[in-house]
Amino acid sequence: MSISKWPASERPREKLLSMGAPALSDAELLAIFLRIGCVGKSAVDVARELLQQFGGLRPLLEASQKEFCRGRGLGMVKYVQLQAVLEMARRHIHADMKVGDLLSSPHLVRDYLRAQLRHHAREVFAVLFLDNQNRLIAYEELFQGTIDGANVYPREVVKQALAHNAAAVIFAHNHPSGLAEPSQADIRITRRLQEALGLVDIRVLDHLVVGDGELVSLAERGWL
């Protein structure tokens, strides 16, 4: 049955307007994005099939262009639209991070770093450069490596921190394996970076390891 023939309270668009987006299921949200279904199936039916095919909403959102375009009802136009929406969401979070003290909004930092790093197929080491009020100056992905690791050079980190006139930094890197547990190498390089930056009076506030849906803080573990 076409969605237009459903009771108004059950139609995804009307439901969103009356109850808010959080009230919708993943399939209903995806159906709004798809806009139309196909012969014999509503957009919600197609959305449910896609979620089953990809294994959930997050794998669909993080799919490569080639993988995404294999989905029923999807294609290049939808892929471009989705990437634009995701980038707007990232920029919205980035703008929020420039307003206040990041230490008072740890969830914001974590959400931002997950969005930036978890989709990378190779290990990426990134730095948040902060001012003396812990507000974001810049986010930079400084080093990229293989699926097993990235070489990190303290001299380059110090150079970039000074260039941004940063008072503090937060490090982050992803584990493409999906496991966020820090390695001994992660702990060692963090301490080396802390020593190098300490020589120029720049504080290291944390080092976050991003896995598949989880994130570990070295500061919370007492390793800083």
From Swiss-Prot:
Residue positions binding Zn(2+): H173, H175, D186
The MPN domain, residue ranges: 102-224
UniProt cross-references to CDD domains, sorted A to Z: MPN_DUF2466
Alphabetic keyword roster: Hydrolase, Metal-binding, Metalloprotease, Protease, Zinc
Motif (JAMM motif) on chain: 173-186
Superkingdom to which the source organism belongs: Bacteria
One of the record's GO molecular function terms: metallopeptidase activity
GO terms classed as biological process: proteolysis
Alphabetical list of InterPro entries matching this protein: MPN (IPR037518), RadC_JAB (IPR025657), RuvA_2-like (IPR010994), UPF0758 (IPR001405), UPF0758_CS (IPR020891), UPF0758_N (IPR046778)
Pfam families: RadC (PF04002), UPF0758_N (PF20582)
Similarity comment: Belongs to the UPF0758 family.
Name the UniProt record assigns to this protein: UPF0758 protein CJA_3522
Species of provenance: Cellvibrio japonicus (strain Ueda107) (Pseudomonas fluorescens subsp. cellulosa)
